[in-house]
């Protein structure tokens, strides 16, 4: 767990570096691990590196272990030579096959030793992927088995190969949190969050957000978090904001096989497109009609390349958002692509207290872009800070307008943050950019801040001068506060 270093945070999102000693490379995170099927390579691994900048990929050691055609070649050549890839390679253990078919014929020790023997850089033990919504008894029993296997995996001699510790627990937040803490206790290196693909397939992004948040509570900040099977670019920003560092998926190839075209807003069918809304080489060199007229293999490869361009482009966008401190604005933007993604964003904000713990106290700017912005971690932090700010005098004015000498002290008020001392006006997040037509959620959040301050100082007499706040906001202000409308005539 000493192979991962965080360079920068935004919310729970992390710019980090994962050192993979066996490969001799350091991978910048967040990043995507394209799934490479050793039997069917829609895009060659060497092309993934040269054209898309792939530093790491994932393949299935269980398929290699059981393949009459590939088992001996991979043992003789090694995984890197077999795939033609110089970067880091992670291998899965067969747990996906276990989830799909109910049984596999290999143990954790056998598959880890095989992964080490073929030259894998990051290995995976055989865990039990417990699907969502199973009864608690089953989830608990399977979790116990997974933990026993992880503890056994920690005793296997794998040399420099990193070993992952999958976190299970179905859709029970307390089981996920406990499983995550137990995974950390094994001393293993990478922490995949397992059995979440059904949630993504069913667009249950709110449930996904709750699962990831629970896992993160148990994991803390000890190592890289891998969201198993997450490969659609529309959800990278949300998952990164929750603290996920690694994503993997075969979606780029599987979707291309079905003539599906990835965007950051969702998925389009090729035959329903008249124009390509993308500027990648595939989309600038071809029209949808031209691709549709090609033979199936050529069309599949070009669509897969487009899907990869969009995927890696979104990873770069997420990285820059973390660097610039506007990851939450990006999440907000991506949430508008699908109603279920908006549900996911709102569920993410249910965990704003958790996100606030690693969110930087100062950034370049706060942009209020939707009603959801009123629930961001910065708003919570400002209102928590009221507990530490002194109030001078017995008569205090809280106003969206100018100060008044009639009071012992005058504080400003800025929706959605609420009251603040004037000397903090030029500090983050009070330098926020907010629309002139502020929405109800911002006023209500500001009123919550007013209530917080008033309750902290019961012996002070407060007057609130507001700019036409709605009744739903004013109802949150304590009864003892005198209310005046900024534009009302005396």
Swiss-Prot record:
Query: Family per UniProt?
Result: Belongs to the archaeosine tRNA-ribosyltransferase family.
**Enzyme Commission number(s) of this protein:** 2.4.2.48
Classification via PANTHER family: QUEUINE TRNA-RIBOSYLTRANSFERASE
How is the co-factor bound, per the entry?
Binds 1 zinc ion per subunit.
Q: What HAMAP family is this protein classified in?
A: TgtA_arch
* Stored Pfam families: TGT
Q: Which domain of life is it from?
A: Archaea
Q: What does this protein do?
A: Exchanges the guanine residue with 7-cyano-7-deazaguanine (preQ0) at position 15 in the dihydrouridine loop (D-loop) of archaeal tRNAs.
Q: Which cofactor does it need?
A: Zn(2+)
- The record places the active site at 92
Name the Gene Ontology molecular function terms of this record: pentosyltransferase activity; zinc ion binding
Report the GO terms under cellular component: cytoplasm
Protein's name in the database: tRNA-guanine(15) transglycosylase
Q: Name one GO biological process term.
A: tRNA wobble guanine modification
Q: Which organism is it from?
A: Haloarcula marismortui (strain ATCC 43049 / DSM 3752 / JCM 8966 / VKM B-1809) (Halobacterium marismortui)
InterPro entries noted in UniProt: ArchSynthase1/Queuine_TRR, ArcTGT_C1_sf, TGT-like_sf, TgtA, tRNA_ribo_trans-like
Q: In which pathway does it act?
A: tRNA modification; archaeosine-tRNA biosynthesis
Write the record's keywords in alphabetical order, separated by commas. Answer: Glycosyltransferase, Metal-binding, Transferase, tRNA processing, Zinc
UniProt gene name: tgtA
UniProt binding sites for Zn(2+): 278, 280, 283
Q: What is the reaction catalyzed?
A: guanosine(15) in tRNA + 7-cyano-7-deazaguanine = 7-cyano-7-carbaguanosine(15) in tRNA + guanine
Where on this chain does substrate bind?
Answer: 127, 195
Q: Top EC class per UniProt?
A: transferase
């Amino acid at each position: 767990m000493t192979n991962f270093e965080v360079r920068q945070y935004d919310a729970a999102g992390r710019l980090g570096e994962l050192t993979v000693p066996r490969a001799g490379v350091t991978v910048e995170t967040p990043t995507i691990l394209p799934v490479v099927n050793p039997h069917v390579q829609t895009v060659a691994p060497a092309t993934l590196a040269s054209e898309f900048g792939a530093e790491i990929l994932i393949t299935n050691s269980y398929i290699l272990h059981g393949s009459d055609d590939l088992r001996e070649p991979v043992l003789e050549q090694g995984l890197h030579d077999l795939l033609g890839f110089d970067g880091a390679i992670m291998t899965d253990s067969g747990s996906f096959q276990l989830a799909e078919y109910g049984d596999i014929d290999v143990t954790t020790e056998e598959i880890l030793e095989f992964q080490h023997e073929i030259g894998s850089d990051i290995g995976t033990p055989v865990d039990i992927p417990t699907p969502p919504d199973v009864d608690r008894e089953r989830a608990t029993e399977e979790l116990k088995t997974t933990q026993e296997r992880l503890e056994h995996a920690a005793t296997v001699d794998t040399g420099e190969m990193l070993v992952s510790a999958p976190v299970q627990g179905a859709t029970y937040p307390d089981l996920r949190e406990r499983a995550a803490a137990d995974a950390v206790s094994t001393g293993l290196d990478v922490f995949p969050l397992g059995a979440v693909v059904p949630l993504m397939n069913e667009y249950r992004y709110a449930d996904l957000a709750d699962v990831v948040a629970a896992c993160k509570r148990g994991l803390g900040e000890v190592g890289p978090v891998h969201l198993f099977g997450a490969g659609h670019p529309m959800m990278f920003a949300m998952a990164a904001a929750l603290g996920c560092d690694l994503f993997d998926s075969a979606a780029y190839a599987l979707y291309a096989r079905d003539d599906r075209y990835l965007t950051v807003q969702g998925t389009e069918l090729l035959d329903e497109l008249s124009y390509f809304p993308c500027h990648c080489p595939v989309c600038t060199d071809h029209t949808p009609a031209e691709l549709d007229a090609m033979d199936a293999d050529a069309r599949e490869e070009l669509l897969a390349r487009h899907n990869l361009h969009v995927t890696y482009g979104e990873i770069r966008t997420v990285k820059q958002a973390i660097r610039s401190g506007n990851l939450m604005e990006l999440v907000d933007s991506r949430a508008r692509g699908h109603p279920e993604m908006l549900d996911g964003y709102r569920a993410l904000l249910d965990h704003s207290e958790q996100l606030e713990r690693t969110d930087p106290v100062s950034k370049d700017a706060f942009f209020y872009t939707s009603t959801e912005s009123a629930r961001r971690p910065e708003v919570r932090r400002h209102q928590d800070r009221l507990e530490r700010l002194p109030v001078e005098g017995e008569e205090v004015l809280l106003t969206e307008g100018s100060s008044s000498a009639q009071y012992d002290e005058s504080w400003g008020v800025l929706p959605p943050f609420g009251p603040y001392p004037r000397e903090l006006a030029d500090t983050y997040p009070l330098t926020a950019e907010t629309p002139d037509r502020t929405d109800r959620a911002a006023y209500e959040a500001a009123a919550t801040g007013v209530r917080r301050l008033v309750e902290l100082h019961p012996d002070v007499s407060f007057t609130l001068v507001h700019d036409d706040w709605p009744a739903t906001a004013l109802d949150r202000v304590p009864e003892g506060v005198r209310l005046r409308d900024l534009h009302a005539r005396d």
